[in-house]
């Protein structure tokens, strides 16, 4: 496995390859990330995993400085899976003119709702780094997790709007035995908080079951927020949306997605669950 620390190294390596799949990450890899890599390896012999904690997608009071960085352990895990290369650029290689002067990618209509409303500029940072990685690595395939469902849809729209020659593949959320979605930020939780945090997924499941008989979305959302509050969360949002474009749900939608973000202590957790509308024609 090659460890490519600069754009120049990456480009020299890339010239020697044919098809390549990319798995973009910020490191501190867990089993959810490794499942993305396994999915990519099923589709492509040459898999590149990028590890870059992207400062553009962090807000002023977020956890950029404290975000866990475990590069050595990450590389060992990726080498064991048979990854071809790991791309670990420095900030000045990715943003040579600095963040303030960097050209940015905006995906309108989807970037300023839900997580985008709570984290202004976040999805601009995500879209910009992913677009740059696509240009740097030039993959035919890129694999992302569905846990970050809004992020996945932002990237899909960006690829569509900019006519990028990349297939974007979403893979199912990997979960702990409790149902808690795997996340690097779970490491911030105490043992007790992890136990409490499992209520987030349980609330999503309960809401999914209720949707089969009740499409009063506002009522369901309010009940879910109350349940999360009683479980020790501070809810950010709990929203039922059209799964395709993340606009407000209607009873006629063929598929919904229930999205939630809530704080457990100081840790912000997100999760989602897709629901097929059996009544849709």
Curated annotation (Swiss-Prot):
GO terms for cellular component: cytosol. The active site is at residue 33. It catalyses: (R)-pantoate + beta-alanine + ATP = (R)-pantothenate + AMP + diphosphate + H(+). GO terms for biological process: pantothenate biosynthetic process. It comes from the Bacteria. One of its GO terms (molecular function) is ATP binding. Beta-alanine binds at residue 57. Pathway: Cofactor biosynthesis; (R)-pantothenate biosynthesis; (R)-pantothenate from (R)-pantoate and beta-alanine: step 1/1. The keyword Lipid metabolism does not apply. Its EC number is 6.3.2.1. PANTHER family: CYTIDYLATE KINASE/PANTOATE-BETA-ALANINE LIGASE, PANTOATE--BETA-ALANINE LIGASE. Belongs to the pantothenate synthetase family. Homodimer. This is Pantothenate synthetase. It comes from Idiomarina loihiensis (strain ATCC BAA-735 / DSM 15497 / L2-TR). The lineage of its organism: Bacteria, Pseudomonadati, Pseudomonadota, Gammaproteobacteria, Alteromonadales. The gene is panC.
């Amino acid at each position: 496995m090659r460890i490519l620390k600069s754009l120049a190294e990456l480009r020299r390596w890339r010239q020697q390859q044919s098809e390549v799949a990319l798995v973009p990450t910020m490191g501190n890899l867990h089993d959810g990330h490794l499942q993305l890599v396994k999915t990519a390896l099923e589709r492509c012999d040459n898999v590149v995993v990028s590890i870059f904690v992207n400062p553009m997608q962090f807000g002023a009071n977020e956890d950029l400085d404290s975000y866990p960085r475990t590069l050595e352990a990450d590389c060992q895990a990726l080498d064991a899976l048979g990854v071809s290369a790991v791309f670990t650029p420095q900030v000045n290689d990715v943003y040579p003119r600095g963040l303030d002067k960097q050209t940015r990618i905006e995906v309108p209509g989807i970037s300023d709702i839900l997580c985008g409303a709570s984290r202004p500029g976040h999805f601009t940072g995500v879209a910009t780094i992913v677009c740059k990685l696509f240009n740097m690595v030039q993959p035919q395939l890129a694999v992302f997790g569905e846990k970050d469902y809004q992020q996945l849809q932002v990237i899909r729209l960006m690829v569509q709007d900019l006519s990028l020659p990349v297939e974007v593949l979403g893979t199912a959320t990997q979960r702990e035995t409790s149902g808690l979605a795997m996340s690097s930020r779970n490491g911030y939780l105490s043992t007790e908080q992890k136990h409490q945090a499992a209520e987030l997924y349980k609330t999503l499941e309960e809401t999914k079951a209720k949707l089969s008989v009740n499409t009063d979305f506002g009522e369901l959302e309010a009940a879910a927020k109350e349940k999360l509050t009683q479980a020790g969360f501070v809810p950010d949002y709990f929203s039922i949306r059209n799964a395709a474009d993340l606009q407000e749900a209607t009873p006629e939608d063929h598929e919904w997605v229930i999205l939630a973000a809530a704080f457990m202590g100081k840790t912000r957790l997100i999760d989602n669950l897709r629901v097929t509308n059996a009544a849709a024609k």
